[in-house]
From Swiss-Prot:
Organism: Mumps virus (strain SBL-1)
Signal peptide: none
Task performed by this protein: Plays an essential role in the inhibition of host immune response. Prevents the establishment of cellular antiviral state by blocking interferon-alpha/beta (IFN-alpha/beta) production and signaling pathway. Interacts with host IFIH1/MDA5 and DHX58/LGP2 to inhibit the transduction pathway involved in the activation of IFN-beta promoter, thus protecting the virus against cell antiviral state. Blocks the type I and II interferon signaling pathways by interacting with host STAT1, STAT2 and STAT3, and mediating their ubiquitination and subsequent proteasomal degradation.
Name of this chain's protein: Non-structural protein V
Pfam families in the cross-refs: zf-Paramyx-P
Length: 224
């Protein structure tokens, strides 16, 4: 059996398909009736007669949309799926690169070495890699000549926590961004009881034990 389609058969198939398309384009649209058996010309495409009715799904007309129904309505409601982090609450920081007055947080810039200027299509990638390394090195403590001795006092107040509940406190968060050839870092504090999100957000205390400000974020608001 020959599995190849001849050139004249290809032309007939194309012509048949064009006739079917022109028929549906020229026929008036009458809701679900436009796909009934009566709307298809006999002999044009017999295989299309049974398929449309199997796939036909009735939808409410436009006149029912937006109307209020009494009791349990059978209309279709649109479902809006919120972002995955919407349930976490908090106030999203619209522009974490520039701290607003009274908002809290510090913006610092990791300057690049002027002698290192990569070129080519991977310039931004190389500069970002350099900025990331310098950003990480900022938080690496230098070697100490002597071992520090911490004096423990029972009942003493821990940093960033209330004396009645040492579990409450703040955690420091950072957001790195690449802006105009330099790496900018925005850092701020959030209560430790708040969730950690991918987007930069300010959260409020949920447990009631976290202070409004801690030793780390006092400098975020400037001088008192």
């Amino acid at each position: 059996m020959d599995q190849f389609i001849k050139q004249d058969e290809t032309g007939d198939l194309i012509e048949t398909g064009m006739n079917v398309a022109n028929h549906f384009l020229s026929a008036p649209i009458q809701g679900t009736n436009s796909l009934s058996k009566a709307s298809i010309i006999p002999g044009v495409a017999p295989v299309l007669i049974g398929n449309p009715e199997q796939k036909n799904i009735q939808h409410p007309t436009a006149s029912h949309q937006g109307s209020k129904s009494k009791g349990s309505g059978s209309g279709v409601r649109s479902i809006i799926v919120p972002p995955s982090e919407a349930s976490n609450g908090g106030t999203q920081i619209p522009e974490p690169l520039f701290a607003q007055t009274g908002q809290g947080g510090i913006v610092t810039t990791v300057y690049q070495d002027p002698t290192i200027q990569p070129t080519g299509s991977y310039r931004s990638v190389e500069l970002a890699k350099i900025g990331k390394e310098r950003m990480i090195n900022r938080f690496v403590e230098k070697p100490r000549t002597s071992t520090p001795v911490t004096e423990f006092k029972r009942g003493g107040r821990e940093p960033c926590s209330r004396p009645d509940n040492p579990r409450g406190g703040h955690r420091r968060e950072w957001s790195l961004s690449w802006v105009q050839g330099e790496v900018r870092v925005f850092e701020w504090c959030n209560p430790i009881c708040s969730p950690i999100t991918a987007a930069a957000r300010f959260h409020s205390c949920k447990c009631g034990n976290c202070p409004a400000k801690c030793d780390q974020c006092e400098r975020d608001y400037g001088p008192p």
